[in-house]
Amino acid sequence: MKVVPSLLLSVLLAQVWLVPGLAPSPQSPETPAPQNQTSRVVQAPREEEEDEQEASEEKAGDEEKAWLTASRQQLAKETSNFGFSLLRKISMRHDGNIVFSPFGTSLAMTGLMLGATGLTETQIKRGLHLQALNPTKPGLLPSLFKGLRETLSRNLELGLTQGSFAFIHKDFDVKETFLNLSKRYFDTECVPMNFRNASQAKRLMNHYINKETRGKIPKLFDEINPETKLILVDYILFKGKWLTPFDPVFTEVDTFHQDKYKTIKVPMMYGAGKFASTFDKNFCCHVLKLPYQGNVTMLVVLMEKMGDQLALEDYLTTDLVETWLRNMKTRNMEVFFPKFKLDQKYEMHELLRQMGIRRISPFADLSELSATGRNLQVSRVLQRTVIEVDERGTEAVAAILSEIIAYSMPPAIKVDRPFHFMIYEETSGMLLFLGRVVNPTLL
């Protein structure tokens, strides 16, 4: 029986301008012009040409900047839509708490795409909702993610740490080009591993991940297939601080309604001040904005009626969220918000298949990753996300027309029933984390 090597992917999460030189205008040897005439006759057109060239370069540069800005905005928008689609798939299998990172999943799958060709590459792009980004620029997607990673890492107030590992079996021949591109775009650290000794490999990889996530994910891997050749791991650690922290003195145990019949007691935080919010009449939901330091925001979506939160998921899109944000009004309000901690782990392989990414196992074409790429398969796509929300902030690892009405908001919003939350980086519009809380006391 032939053993097919398996590729295991786990998700935790220069531009050169070449301008031709201008050749000097030739002068006729038969009729040499006096020096002062040469200056007037030849130099003036050259100055005009140089001015035209500079104007052309400036215009091209402006067009390139505008195009890159539009591409970054489209990347953020489509990654959010991918996240909402993935939420719907997860929700079909899980009726409880949900939390994951659309950004982390897109980052890892784009990293895998560096080694993919043919139908495998096409399906990954479509599954991530990124097929519309300029297909004539093959390095565009990883370049955009690289720029986004660098922007996020420079924001020290944000408290976001992102990294990537490639655990490679010691005898497995990975193409140097793939490793170089992974390092260039995703700063991937390559670590040799002996997967034949599965228990030792599991222990070492868990040690690496535990260290990089600062103890938040001490045990990512429960078991390792000894036939594994390569494991790609992306991790994201978010330690956000509220722009206006909740005062722990006012945190009290209160009632949280899981559904019409079941209630639980939870630590309920309290804050008073100016908060941005809106009310969507179509969906009968309150949308509350809780800002972090570093230009990051948590949006909390709270349905008026118990049990309607599942129906809302069918209509979540970037356009709907943008409509909410445009109609936000800032008012003096009281906010009651539960403390919670979630720790969720998803085998995303089947979920991604349902979203059209089928040619990663079997029949994957990873020939840009290895010379044996047509005999490889992605055996697992794993994401584990941990998020904790308290008085100080958040610590996390990993088209329908909506009618918005202006009305007198209630003096208080009390989040005492199931709700959705989204954590955005506002400058880029990137959706970092997305989740649903049904029971704040359960991981």
From Swiss-Prot:
Biased composition (Basic and acidic residues): 56-66
Highest taxon of source: Eukaryota
Signal peptide span: 1-23
Predominant cellular place of this UniProt entry's protein: secreted
Gene Ontology CC terms: extracellular space
Keyword Signal part of the UniProt annotation: yes
Keyword line: Blood coagulation, Glycoprotein, Hemostasis, Heparin-binding, Phosphoprotein, Protease inhibitor, Secreted, Serine protease inhibitor, Signal
Location of the protein in the cell: Secreted
Disulfide bond residue pairs: none
Gene Ontology BP, a term: blood coagulation
Keyword Lyase: no
Miscellaneous: Heparin acts as an important cofactor, producing 20 to 100-fold accelerations of SERPINA10 reactions with factor Xa and factor XIa.
Biological role stated in the UniProt entry: Inhibits activity of the coagulation protease factor Xa in the presence of PROZ, calcium and phospholipids. Also inhibits factor XIa in the absence of cofactors.
Family indicated by similarity: Belongs to the serpin family.
Name of the molecule in the record: Protein Z-dependent protease inhibitor
Source taxonomy: Eukaryota, Metazoa, Chordata, Craniata, Vertebrata
Gene name as annotated: SERPINA10
